[in-house]
Amino acid sequence: LARSHPESVGKDFLQADAQSCKFEPEGFDLAISRFGVMFFENPFKAFQNIKSAVQKGREMRFVCWAPISANDFFLSPLNTVVDITGVSFAEPGKEPGPLAFSDRTYLYSILKTAEFSSVNIDVIETSISTKDSVEKNASLLMEIGMGFRAIKEAAPTDEVLNEIREAFVADGKKRQKNGLISYDATIYRVSAVA
C-alpha cells in the first residue's frame, strides 16, 4: 500500500541490485530485505555497498533462511525426491540461493567483514502456509526449492516425475488443516548497524 502512494507516507522506495547499484552515500535511513540477500554473487561486496548507502548509526534489517534441517519446506520435498530417485544430493553450501546464509557463523563474519556493527541474528521458529490446493502446492514444489534442485540433478523419466508429484500431493494432504498446507520453518531475523 505504501509503495502505491509513497507521497502519503513520505517515503521513497528503490528496487535495485544492491551489489552493483551506485547509491547516494548515506542516502538511506534504513535498508530492508525479505529473503532477497541470499542471492548475491559477491555477498561481501553487496553488504559493503549497502552499508555505504545507509546513514551512519542506522540499521540494515533482513530475514533469511536457517539451515535446511530446520526447514520442512526445503527438507521434506528433498527427502521425497531422494527416496524416490536415489539421487545423491549435497546441501548447496554458500552459493547464491535460498540457503546461502543458513550458517550463522558465516553470515556474522560477512557482516562484520563488511564493517557493520551490533550484528544481531535472532533464530525464529515459525511455519509457512499456503491456501493452495494440494495439487497446486505439488506443482510449486516441482519448480522451486531443494526438491526441484534434486529433480534436476536426478533427471528422472516422466513416470518417475509423476511418482514424485503424487508423493508431493500425498504429503500436502497430510499437512493440510483448515484449508492450509503448513510447513515448519526457521528463519534468521538479522539486524546490523552501519
Question: Model-flagged regions — what are they?
Answer:
Residues 120-178:
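C-terminal helical/coil "lid" or tail adjacent to the Rossmann-like core of SAM-dependent
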Residues 40-41, 54-56:
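Helix-to-beta-strand junctions that scaffold the AdoMet/dcAdoMet cofactor pocket
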Residues 19-30:
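A short acidic, Gly/Pro-enriched loop at the edge of an enzyme's catalytic core
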Residues 29-44, 66-68:
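A short SAM/SAH-binding and catalytic strip from SAM-dependent methyltransferases
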